[in-house]
Amino acid sequence: MEPGKKDYIDSPLRMQPASLSGASTPTIDLDGLSWPCQGTQRRIDTAEEEKVKKISNAISTILECLGEDPERQGLLGTPERYAKAMLYFTKGYEQNLTEVINEAVFQEDHEEMVIVRDIDVFSLCEHHLVPFIGKIHIGYIPRKRVLGLSKLARIANMFSRRLQVQERLTKQVAQAIQAVLKPQGVAVVMEATHMCMVMRGVEKPGSSTVTSSLTGIFQRSHKTREEFFRLIGKF
């Protein structure tokens, strides 16, 4: 790939993925924020054993650079365990909306707000590869179509199981629901504690970051936004 060239098509609508040759499964993302790059497709096509071996070798090198002995008893299995853990923490790269939704969209004559709050999420900051942990609150106002409630949590999990920044994660969840249901609007609020602010840097335990992403009527109507924030018990 040429330096600076994107692996996705950043069209005006930003809804068209770049074609990936040899793709065995569609990987769906939104808004050009996390389109699968060539490395993502390689991950999907590479055998699990090979991925674990490559990551394990890299971790052994890191341990040596830290002044440790990867061959000592306490660390003998650490590189392989870490490799398997990282593949699990980032399994969202191998998931897509079609599989996550699994046709759980239903016709329903309901046009009032639907909210699922306090969804626990765990992700990895893409800047330091350390965790951020928090909760997501999701609301939407249907337009004759509703989504199975568990699917809202599964969408949040799919995007959180990638290397992320909180702002992008919040926006991706909102845009995914908007794309799937085409409702009157979607509201997503996320609160999280970032270990990169707790364990290093400013070292401020107890601090939290709040982000939001609003579409449709939640953007246009102050009253609707206010109702959502009141119902999730925030602000």
From Swiss-Prot:
Pathway named in the protein's UniProt entry: Cofactor biosynthesis; 7,8-dihydroneopterin triphosphate biosynthesis; 7,8-dihydroneopterin triphosphate from GTP: step 1/1
Activity: how regulated: GTP shows a positive allosteric effect, and tetrahydrobiopterin inhibits the enzyme activity.
Catalytically driven reaction(s): GTP + H2O = 7,8-dihydroneopterin 3'-triphosphate + formate + H(+)
Sequence ranges of Polar residues compositional bias: 18-27
Protein keywords: Allosteric enzyme, Folate biosynthesis, GTP-binding, Hydrolase, Metal-binding, Nucleotide-binding, Phosphoprotein, Zinc
Sequence positions bearing Phosphothreonine: T25
Keyword Acetylation belongs to the record: no
Record Gene3D superfamilies: 1.10.286.10, 3.30.1130.10
GO BP: any one term: folic acid biosynthetic process
Record has Chaperone as a keyword: no
Positions bound to Zn(2+): C125, H128, C196
Molecular functions (GO terms): GTP binding; GTP cyclohydrolase I activity; zinc ion binding
CC terms in the record's Gene Ontology section: cytoplasm; cytosol; nucleus
Residue segments, region Disordered: 1-27
Record EC number: 3.5.4.16
Family, per entry: Belongs to the GTP cyclohydrolase I family.
Function of the molecule: GTP cyclohydrolase 1 is the first enzyme in the biosynthetic pathway leading to folic acid.
HAMAP family referenced in this protein's UniProt entry, alphabetically: FolE
Subunit structure, as described in the record: Toroid-shaped homodecamer, composed of two pentamers of five dimers.
Name of the protein this chain belongs to: GTP cyclohydrolase 1
Species annotation: Schizosaccharomyces pombe (strain 972 / ATCC 24843) (Fission yeast)
